[in-house]
Amino acid sequence: MAIVEARDRIGGRTFVAEQDGQKYEIGGTWIHWGQPYVWNEIHRYGLTITESLSGAADTMSILSADGLVTDTAEAIGTDLEQILTAYCDIDGAQGRVAFANPHAASPELLASTDALSLADRFAMIPAAGRQRDLLLSFLTMNAATDPAKGGFHDQLRWWALGEYSADSLLKRLGRYKIAEGTSALALALLKDANADLALGHPVSQISVVDGAVRVRTKAMEIRCKAVVVAAPLNVLGDIDFTSGVSHERLAAQRERHVCAGTKFIARVDRSVGAWVGFAPFPNPLTMVVADREVGGKSVLVGFGPDDSIDLGDIRLIESELRKFLPGVVVEEVFAHDWTNDPYAKGGWTWFSPGQTSRVLNELQTPAPPLFFANTDWASGWRGFIDGAIEEGIRSARDLLSYLRASR
């Protein structure tokens, strides 16, 4: 078995930067026992868990047109719980009936919700004051784009995966981390694979000729019985599938998801405690969380919905953080531009209105001898590490069945 990887490392949209003995998760970070596939692997490899301070915050702030408001996490958390419940309550039962199984939406649910954007649904509910700002911030953070571009159906799926509770969902999204770093999990999986690894070889073309697969890069050509294509959705369209893939699948592969936000990690000159900040769209920052403290100084993680923050401009980042934390000084920033990364072209997965109905089934359907596995079309925690493992298991099962049948 051979792994042909475009990057100079494995791990996709997750990797760890290390400095002065500290690990900084530049991409995917948080995990939870409510994400069963990744939790199983964490225990398989004996990895340990640590927590972000923001996962048990005691204070929260909301930046709105009326200025900055800081309150207890309990008070603001109650507001978020109330307004997000109203937003996701499409059946009078908090979504529990309509989306009883978050891994498998019914055709009826898709028909009634998939065409809506986050903004469409936002306009349907009475939201005012800080509840309005909280909800708009949270929705923008989740989709990492303008709420008019993000699909409402994906928010419903997250809500169901979070057990129909804002508090429960937040714990799954941003409380627990792998102490050794996500790269440690990726390396453990690679070691178990016992595969030949070719780094720095972007695949340019895949074709099927007489039942065999030909994979081409700039430097080499590989012929094999079958291939698992693990490129993310926003990159699939860059690979030339000359044969073996239907027109319908090619169309699905060319339709990108909409997550195009920014993430950075900033070490600042003071402790801000266990704190979370929210700001509604179109603020350049929609959410900032205190991850941990190093030497009495906070390490913050900030998220924005677009490219309005230059990730290489430490003073601009400082200026935006001062809107939440007056006078704060940024000492160092760690970041990666995932949207302009040629092997990612975006962050975690968020579908546009109608996209689930258009592409999900096609993306999940194998085209032997070609198989496709990426978190971007997982049924459950799509866009998360958990979804990547889910898709890997599914495609491995399909591949083994194909190889056994073709002997």
Regions found by a protein language model. Give the residues of each.
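Glycine-rich FAD pyrophosphate-binding loop
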Residues: 1-19
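Dinucleotide-binding Rossmann-like beta1-alpha1 core, especially the glycine-rich loop
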Residues: 22-95
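Active-site rim elements
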Residues: 24-31, 103-111, 171-179, 250-255, ...
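Active-site/ligand-binding neighborhood in enzyme catalytic cores
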Residues: 99-201, 230, 240
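Short helix-loop capping/hinge motifs at secondary-structure junctions, enriched
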Residues: 69, 271-276, 309-310
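Conserved flavin/dinucleotide-binding core of flavoenzymes
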Residues: 212, 277-407
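Central helical "cap/lid" subdomain
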Residues: 201-202, 207-208, 216-276, 323
